[in-house]
């Protein structure tokens, strides 16, 4: 359905955006001044000042310092609080003015009314990056909105950048910079190629078990109220970040429609950009305003903008932590021909139905491959390679499993593989599977999405975890597995200029 021509404000002060001739267009209403988008001080600081409560607990400046030390941060840490002399073995300074050394980044975990004066002190110290963890700003009331405007004005005049307010901050596991203001419950994150940014602290380490998920992170950023640093700034920063392969975002609003479209069009062909946007309904849009002080974007127009820019739009919160893995851990699909190896024919048929949604077609195995499979077990060389029948009657099943998978992966008629594994109730099977997957890691240029199931939840979890460690992304169900392959295929087509 073609969206009707409609005007919607996608910014507090910048542009009016609408549909015009089948494209996302913006007309100026004031000018949003794009400032320095080199955000390296937020993710690669050499020195950090932490201003706020240093009382031991599950939240506050004490926890920021503790998580930095636990993660192995190599830079200098300057705790600031007039009531302390030492914390966690570090000297505490009475005020920011008492620190003679250069400070790259400041954390403000203080009462909202104290933030403007502290921002002025930061300006006097020529500090260029501030993370305002404190809440109670535009998301709360009129006084908070005025305070937010005040700190933004101070920052602009001083050439400072702000993340927040009302934020859980950032993380960069590639260098041990994980300054979480909340107690995490684990020491560090798995380093990988996924950058995840959001208007919620739900993506920060204290809220999600990244260590258990084997979700390889390059950067994390909670925008908070995004009074300054926003989605466009992060897209531009991550565009050239050598650690980031795929960019994932949760957004409640778009501040500058014109800039968002321009930046997305430039970044998306280089790196996949996956976005989940809330506020799809009128009620959801209303509530998002009270959450971060956002001004919601018309969902239909946002969807059209994503399509125009080449952004992959996510449907569920869980997909933020599932679908990006296919881009981080696997090579891009060479084409849309899908191979299926399963333990039951029913799963294979369901997979074919799902695949059609994304333009994937089931691979027809070559006569040579079919003959090889039929030699392993009668009638095995079909479109859906069903391993269930041989498993039921062959004593040395694990011996032939490797032959079956190798034969399928060597077939040139297949570009990507939906790989279904049944763990069995026996731990010995898991070890045999893993022995095989270690041998084939990186050997075949096929995009592989794996779904693991079985009668023992602990065994399924163990094998899933160890497969992820080997670089084979495991998904929670059939549908998500096929969707991962589907969006990877669609992105590959667009990158080649075919869409």
Predicted feature residues:
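Intrinsically disordered, low-complexity segments enriched in serine/proline and basic residues
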Residues: 3, 11-17
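Catalytic-core regions of core metabolic enzymes
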Residues: 26-499
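N-terminal leader/targeting segments
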Residues: 3-6, 35
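Generic short N-terminal amphipathic or hydrophobic helices
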Residues: 6-7, 30
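Short Gly/Ser/Thr- and charged-rich N-terminal loops/segments
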Residues: 17-20, 24
């Amino acid at each position: 359905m073609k969206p009707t021509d409609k005007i919607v404000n996608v910014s507090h002060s910048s542009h009016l955006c609408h549909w015009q001739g089948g494209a996302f267009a913006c007309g100026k209403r004031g000018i949003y001044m794009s400032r320095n988008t080199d955000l390296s001080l937020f993710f690669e600081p050499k020195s950090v000042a932490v201003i706020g409560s240093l009382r031991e607990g599950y939240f506050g400046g004490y926890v920021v310092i503790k998580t930095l030390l636990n993660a192995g941060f190599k830079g200098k840490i300057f705790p600031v609080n007039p009531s302390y002399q030492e914390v966690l073995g570090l000297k505490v300074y009475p005020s920011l003015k008492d620190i003679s050394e250069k400070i790259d980044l400041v954390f403000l975990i203080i009462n909202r009314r104290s933030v403007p004066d502290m921002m002025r002190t930061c300006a006097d110290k020529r500090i260029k990056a501030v993370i305002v963890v404190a809440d109670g700003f535009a998301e709360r009331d009129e006084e908070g909105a005025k305070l937010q405007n005040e700190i933004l004005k101070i920052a602009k005049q001083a050439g400072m950048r702000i993340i927040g307010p009302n934020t859980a901050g950032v993380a960069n596991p590639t260098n041990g910079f994980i300054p979480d203001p909340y107690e995490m419950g684990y020491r560090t994150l798995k380093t990988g190629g996924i950058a995840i940014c959001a208007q919620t602290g739900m993506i920060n380490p204290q809220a999600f078990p990244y260590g258990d998920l084997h979700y390889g992170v390059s950067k994390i950023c909670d925008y908070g109220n995004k009074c300054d640093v926003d989605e466009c700034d992060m897209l531009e920063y991550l565009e050239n970040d050598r650690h980031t392969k795929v960019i994932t975002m949760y957004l409640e609003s778009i501040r500058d429609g014109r800039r968002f479209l321009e930046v997305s069009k430039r970044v998306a062909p280089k790196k996949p950009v996956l976005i989940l946007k809330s506020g799809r309904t009128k009620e959801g849009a209303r509530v998002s305003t009270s959450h971060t002080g956002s001004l919601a974007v018309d969902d239909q127009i946002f969807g059209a903008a994503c399509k125009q820019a080449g952004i992959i739009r996510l449907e569920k919160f869980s997909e933020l932590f599932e679908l990006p893995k296919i881009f981080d851990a696997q090579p891009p699909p060479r084409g849309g021909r899908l191979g299926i190896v399963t333990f039951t024919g029913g799963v294979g048929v369901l997979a074919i139905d799902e695949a059609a949604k994304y333009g994937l077609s089931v691979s027809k195995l070559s006569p040579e491959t079919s003959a090889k499979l039929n030699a392993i077990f009668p009638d095995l060389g079909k479109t859906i390679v069903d391993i269930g029948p041989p498993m039921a009657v062959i004593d040395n099943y694990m011996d032939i499993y490797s032959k079956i998978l190798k034969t399928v992966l060597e077939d040139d008629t297949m570009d990507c593989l939906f790989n279904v594994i049944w763990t069995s109730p026996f731990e010995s099977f898991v070890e045999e599977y893993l022995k095989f997957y270690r041998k084939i890691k990186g050997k075949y240029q096929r995009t592989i999405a794996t779904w693991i199931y079985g009668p023992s939840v602990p065994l399924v979890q163990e094998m899933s975890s160890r497969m992820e460690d080997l670089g084979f992304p495991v998904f929670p169900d059939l549908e998500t597995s096929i969707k991962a392959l589907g969006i990877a295929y669609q992105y590959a087509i667009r990158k080649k200029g075919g869409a």
